[in-house]
């Protein structure tokens, strides 16, 4: 039995992960934590999320005493916190010997030079960063098992990389073009005008400047053009990706490339059949559908995930179970 502390449990991702871990027979929740100045401290989780009324846990402030209690009692800590907050908390808990599963972007790049540009801070813990593993569960299981510092991927990168990584050896130098739409929960729980009921509408954002673009490119080993879109639905991501494959590539070659997922129970791949967001919402699954034109050399692949599940909480749970061999 492994004991897990969840910090940032009042947000959509933290609450979703709480529900997932609560349902696991081999995991227990050491505690749920929010910042000391949070308006949610002291509240039962079910007051914020009535659908979790079966979880009788209260949100505690992350005081120094609380951190000491986590170190004494927990086997691992999950950080569903802001990037700049995770930066320091991850390093501290790692130094105390706990396994850390960070859902922010604070440890996703191995190159410290990336952080000022994409996250607005200098990375102060290069020695911890050097130990961090990118937690793309279907691809990095061996590394996830071997380290105590796991950077859980972003939601768009999870959808995009699951679709693209099998094709890496078949790609030309032409940049893959990724157009992805996410539900409004991807913007977080804080009230914002553009995600309010009366204002939300399908629109691109972060054009040619979203921080998930270099994350995808780094893990793929090739530059990409990535355009995220805000959708007027709650949950889910659909990424439609166009790539050019090397001359002579056949449909059979593509099918063989995607056979890497034949033993991956959470990834479903279909030829000439494309996924819908509703097929994956509230599941840990990724559905891929692809079609290849041998004459032009262009392939279109669509990837559907739940942004709060496979794009965050359920992938964190995958990483936890891989790390502890559960």
UniProtKB/Swiss-Prot annotation:
One of its GO terms (biological process) is L-arginine biosynthetic process. One of its GO terms (cellular component) is cytoplasm. GO terms for molecular function: N-acetyl-gamma-glutamyl-phosphate reductase activity; NAD binding; NADP+ binding. The active site is at residue 155. Keywords: Amino-acid biosynthesis, Arginine biosynthesis, Cytoplasm, NADP, Oxidoreductase. The keyword Amino-acid biosynthesis applies. InterPro entries: AGPR_AS, AGPR_type-1, NAD(P)-bd_dom_sf, NAGSA_dehydrogenase, Semialdehyde_DH_NAD-bd. CDD domains: AGPR_1_C (cd23934), AGPR_1_N (cd17895). It catalyses: N-acetyl-L-glutamate 5-semialdehyde + phosphate + NADP(+) = N-acetyl-L-glutamyl 5-phosphate + NADPH + H(+). It is an enzyme of class 1 (oxidoreductase). Pathway: Amino-acid biosynthesis; L-arginine biosynthesis; N(2)-acetyl-L-ornithine from L-glutamate: step 3/4. Its main location: cytoplasm. Its EC number is 1.2.1.38. PROSITE patterns: ARGC. Transmembrane segments: none annotated. The keyword Oxidoreductase applies. It is found in: Cytoplasm. Belongs to the NAGSA dehydrogenase family. Type 1 subfamily. PANTHER family: N-ACETYL-GAMMA-GLUTAMYL-PHOSPHATE REDUCTASE, CHLOROPLASTIC-RELATED (PTHR32338:SF10), N-ACETYL-GAMMA-GLUTAMYL-PHOSPHATE REDUCTASE, CHLOROPLASTIC-RELATED-RELATED (PTHR32338). Catalyzes the NADPH-dependent reduction of N-acetyl-5-glutamyl phosphate to yield N-acetyl-L-glutamate 5-semialdehyde. This is N-acetyl-gamma-glutamyl-phosphate reductase. The gene is argC.
């Amino acid at each position: 039995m492994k004991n897990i502390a969840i910090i940032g449990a009042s947000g959509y991702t933290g609450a979703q992960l709480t529900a997932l871990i609560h349902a696991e027979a081999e995991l227990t929740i050491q505690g749920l934590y929010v910042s000391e100045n949070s308006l949610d401290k002291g509240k039962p989780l079910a007051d914020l999320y009535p659908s979790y009324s079966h979880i009788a846990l209260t949100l505690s402030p992350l005081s120094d005493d609380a951190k000491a209690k986590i170190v004494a009692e927990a086997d691992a800590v999950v950080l569903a916190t802001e990037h700049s907050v995770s930066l320091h908390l991850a390093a501290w808990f790692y130094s105390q010997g706990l396994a850390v599963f960070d859902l922010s972007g604070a440890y996703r790049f191995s190159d410290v030079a990336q952080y000022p540009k994409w996250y607005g801070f200098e990375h102060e813990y290069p020695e911890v960063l050097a130990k961090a593993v990118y937690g793309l569960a279907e691809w990095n299981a061996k590394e996830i098992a071997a380290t105590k510092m796991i950077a859980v991927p972003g939601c768009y990168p999870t959808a995009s990389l699951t679709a693209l990584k099998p094709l890496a050896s078949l790609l030309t130098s032409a940049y893959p073009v990724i157009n992805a739409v996410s539900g409004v929960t991807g913007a977080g729980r804080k009230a914002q005008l553009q995600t309010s009921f009366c204002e939300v509408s399908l629109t691109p954002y972060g054009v040619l400047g979203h921080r998930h673009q270099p994350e995808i490119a780094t893990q793929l080993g090739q530059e990409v053009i990535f355009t995220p879109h805000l959708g007027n639905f709650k949950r889910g991501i659909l990424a439609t990706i166009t790539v050019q494959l090397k001359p002579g590539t056949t449909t059979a070659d593509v099918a063989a490339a995607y056979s890497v997922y034949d033993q991956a129970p959470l990834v479903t791949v279909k030829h000439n059949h494309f996924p819908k967001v509703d097929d994956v919402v509230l599941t840990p699954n990724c559905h891929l559908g692809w079609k290849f034109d041998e004459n032009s050399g262009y392939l279109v692949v669509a990837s559907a995930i739940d942004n709060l599940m496979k794009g965050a909480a359920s992938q964190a749970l995958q990483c936890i179970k891989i790390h502890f061999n559960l």
